[in-house]
């Protein structure tokens, strides 16, 4: 084959034209692959087998997730498990365009990224940088999983704000992935908290948690390490679980109503919601 498959494929994104983008978080996964929807190879972005370099413009560092900004024809890489940055490339060519680190800083792979709950977070991403999602109104939401935080930027990397969720989580962190609600304003953010085994529904304007659902377990509606999250055009939610979870769950959209129970365990039966 004219390409090297990731040692551990991680992150998949479908472009508007149907192309499939795949990252990897295994050893040597310093590249991203692009295929047609039928599996025909298109290109490799980056070079496989390279070491960490969060300032490189030629390779990446175990990309966790890919998100495509249709209007700008750009792909955002959450880069990643090895590098500590957001990287942006051209969708049509894969050409490198720009990058930035935490708070919009230039990444520094030698910096101290110690995280102590209740203290200011590190000035560099602690990592893994696990999501980088552009919104409809020109912002980019970045999951710094190991520091329990979401940082918000403009698309040019200008820092806007930071919010910490479940700051005493430690271990593998609380901010694993986000998805937006599908209304034009993207009023809500859905946050997958893989360490605490739940999903948080967040008001995007205030960034406050409105409601959570889920708890640890293997039954329907419970989670073992919810790793990734997505929404469809009907606002249904899809979650994937890693480790022993190893499954996909679908949650049907029930509309918007007042919150009566802020922290709900399994979201069933529906007549109790």
Task: For the regions a language model picked out, list residue spans one by one.
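Eukaryotic scaffold repeat domains enriched in small/polar residues
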Residues: 1-273
């Amino acid at each position: 084959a004219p390409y090297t498959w990731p040692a551990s494929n991680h992150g998949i994104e479908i472009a508007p034209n149907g192309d499939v983008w795949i990252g990897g978080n295994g050893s040597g996964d310093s590249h991203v692959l692009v295929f047609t929807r039928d599996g025909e190879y298109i290109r490799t972005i980056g070079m496989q087998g390279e070491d960490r370099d969060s300032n490189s413009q030629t390779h990446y560092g175990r990309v966790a997730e890919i998100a495509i900004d249709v209007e700008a024809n750009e792909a955002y890489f959450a880069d990643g498990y090895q590098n500590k940055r957001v990287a942006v490339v051209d969708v049509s060519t894969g050409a490198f365009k720009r990058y930035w680190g935490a708070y919009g800083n230039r990444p520094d792979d030698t910096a101290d990224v110690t995280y102590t709950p209740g203290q200011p977070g590190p000035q560099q991403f602690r990592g893994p940088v696990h999501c980088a999602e552009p919104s409809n109104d020109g912002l980019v939401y970045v999951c710094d999983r190991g520091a329990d935080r979401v940082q918000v930027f403009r698309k040019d990397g200008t820092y806007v704000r930071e919010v910490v969720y479940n700051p005493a989580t430690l271990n593998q962190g609380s901010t694993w992935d986000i998805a937006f609600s599908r209304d034009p304003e993207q009023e809500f953010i859905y946050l997958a908290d893989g360490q605490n085994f739940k999903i948080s529904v967040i008001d995007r304007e205030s960034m406050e948690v409105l409601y959570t659902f889920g708890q640890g377990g293997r039954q329907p509606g419970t989670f073992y390490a919810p790793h990734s999250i997505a929404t469809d055009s009907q606002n249904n939610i899809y979650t994937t679980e890693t480790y022993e979870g190893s499954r996909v769950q679908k949650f049907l959209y029930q509309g918007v109503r007042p919150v009566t129970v802020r922290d709900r365990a399994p979201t069933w039966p529906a007549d109790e919601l």
